[in-house]
């Protein structure tokens, strides 16, 4: 048997982190088993669906690198198939027409609540029977699935273990509305059957749907897939993760400067573990992932942990991979990196200091763009009269360098210190402010090596002019 999983979001909003984790688990299980992963868009809610949401889901999946083997399939393109299966159940007396209006059902529900009874649909209720008997052909009706009344539905959840629900606790589910459109729970079953889905990985909010769907599978004569229901993701305050906790859309994390590898690594650990290991390459995730190792308990989303992971991936990933995802942020900040050092070299030097790609894009501007002003605080502290001579000596030595390397620049700084008998800080910090415009950067010799000789000379001269003007105005 070829394992086949699916991710089946409804296009009523963005791809949120809970859905992304479900998609990741489903994708990993398929890859771990040498199987296939299907993407299906469950767009039967015609009032709430939008093409914008479909596009956002596809963009999020592509950004995370969760490539699908089949699809995307759209339920709205399969209504004829669903209605064919509804008619099959009607013909076999496994479904029936119900003419009870919404108003009548609301009235019955209110009576049940007043009598402290559990509100539920009962086909044998006198008022419902009367409505069905009084109906004429052509009157609006829904089609209900005739749920078994005896016995129980038992299934072995791959995460939660054995689950059993008595059939007498379940209503006769509506499977076709009065407007002729099929309902979610029915479409899902027909889709999973037609698409050969063997394993359904989804959120725990679907557990109540599962026994109802299992009865429909069996009524259709379809094989019942294996189910695995993931626990929810909580905010750091213990409440269900929502917009008030900050970003919940996958693409918001892109916008905030997270790498997809970091977000995938973080999401896989929200409920799954392999010993004490924290960092997983995609290959390791695929090889090690198991549904049996997924926790039944809810996991709390921790942004600090995600930032730590993101910093790890910025520091340790192939710089070309980081550059690929950095480009979006460079475009947002209107920073052209074609006029300057290779972006991969800059990433190697600056990346280890950054927790997000937004920070990285902000911190590399001085490699590619000249500036006309120094950061006020850094200039006030380091571009003073005492820095004039060290910078003048450094400028002369910089102009004399013929082989522009980090090693030669390091030696230049050491030579300035030796010649003037000063400590490293007396030249290092003024030089850093001069060539970067601010007081924070990696090692100044390495920074200068990438900025290039021409720019460094011009910036040191600008710093000396700043000091002269400052002294003149003192």
From Swiss-Prot:
Motif ('KMSKS' region): 240-244
Keyword ATP-binding annotated: yes
Coiled coil: none
Name assigned to this protein: Glutamate--tRNA ligase
Catalytic activity: tRNA(Glu) + L-glutamate + ATP = L-glutamyl-tRNA(Glu) + AMP + diphosphate
Family: Belongs to the class-I aminoacyl-tRNA synthetase family. Glutamate--tRNA ligase type 1 subfamily.
Organism for this UniProt entry: Vibrio parahaemolyticus serotype O3:K6 (strain RIMD 2210633)
UniProt short sequence motif 'HIGH' region, positions renumbered to this chain: 9-19
GO biological process: glutamyl-tRNA aminoacylation
Any GO molecular function: glutamate-tRNA ligase activity
Residues given in the record as ATP binding sites: 243
Alphabetical UniProt keywords: Aminoacyl-tRNA synthetase, ATP-binding, Cytoplasm, Ligase, Nucleotide-binding, Protein biosynthesis
UniProt xrefs under HAMAP family: Glu_tRNA_synth_type1
Name of the gene encoding the protein in the UniProt record: gltX
Major localisation: cytoplasm
Pfam families registered for this protein in UniProt: Anticodon_2, tRNA-synt_1c
Cellular component, GO annotation: cytosol
Subcellular location: Cytoplasm
Subunit structure: Monomer.
Lineage start: Bacteria, Pseudomonadati, Pseudomonadota, Gammaproteobacteria, Vibrionales
NCBIfam families per record: gltX_bact
């Amino acid at each position: 048997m070829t394992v086949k999983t699916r991710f089946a979001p409804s296009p009523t909003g963005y791809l949120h982190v809970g859905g992304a984790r479900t998609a990741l688990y489903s994708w990993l299980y398929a890859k771990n088993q040498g199987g296939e992963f299907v993407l299906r868009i469950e767009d039967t809610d015609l009032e709430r669906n939008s093409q914008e949401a479909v596009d956002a889901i596809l963009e999020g999946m592509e950004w995370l690198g969760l490539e699908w083997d089949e699809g995307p399939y759209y339920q709205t393109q399969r209504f004829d198939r669903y209605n064919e299966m509804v008619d099959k159940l009607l013909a076999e007396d496994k479904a029936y027409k119900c003419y009870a209006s919404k108003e009548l059902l609301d009235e019955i529900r209110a009576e049940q609540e007043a009598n402290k009874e559990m509100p539920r649909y009962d086909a044998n209720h006198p008022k419902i029977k009367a409505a069905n008997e009084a109906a004429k052909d052509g009157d609006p009706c829904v089609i209900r699935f005739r749920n078994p009344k005896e016995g129980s539905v038992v299934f072995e959840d791959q995460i939660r273990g054995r689950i059993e629900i008595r059939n007498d606790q379940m209503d006769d589910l509506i499977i076709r509305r009065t407007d002729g459109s099929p309902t979610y729970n029915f479409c899902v079953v027909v889709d999973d059957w037609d698409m050969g889905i063997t394993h359904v990985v989804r959120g725990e909010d679907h557990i109540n749907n599962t026994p109802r769907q299992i009865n429909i599978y069996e009524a259709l004569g379809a094989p019942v897939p294996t189910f695995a229901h993931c626990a929810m993701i909580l905010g750091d305050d213990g409440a269900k993760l929502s917009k008030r906790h900050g970003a919940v859309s996958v693409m918001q994390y892109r916008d905030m400067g997270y790498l997809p590898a970091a977000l995938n690594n973080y999401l896989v650990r929200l409920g799954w573990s392999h010993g004490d290991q924290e960092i997983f390459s995609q290959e390791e995730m695929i090889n090690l992932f198991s549904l049996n190792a997924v926790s039944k308990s809810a996991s709390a989303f921790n942004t600090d942990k995600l930032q730590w992971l993101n910093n790890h991936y910025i520091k340790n990933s192939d710089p070309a991979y980081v550059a690929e995802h950095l480009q979006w942020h460079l475009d947002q900040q209107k920073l052209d990196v074609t006029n300057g050092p290779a972006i991969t070299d800059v990433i190697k030097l600056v990346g280890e200091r950054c927790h997000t790609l937004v920070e990285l894009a902000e911190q590399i501007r001085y490699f590619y763009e000249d500036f006309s002003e120094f950061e006020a605080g850094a200039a006030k502290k380091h571009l003073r009269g005492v820095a004039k001579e060290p910078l003048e000596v450094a400028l002369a030595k910089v102009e004399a360098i013929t082989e522009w390397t980090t090693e030669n620049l390091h030696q230049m700084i050491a030579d300035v210190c030796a010649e003037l008998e000063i400590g490293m800080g007396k030249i290092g910090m003024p030089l850093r402010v001069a060539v970067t415009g601010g007081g924070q950067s990696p090692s100044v010799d390495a920074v200068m090596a990438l900025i290039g000789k021409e720019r460094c000379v011009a910036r040191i001269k600008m710093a000396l002019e700043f000091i002269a003007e400052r002294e003149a105005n003192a």
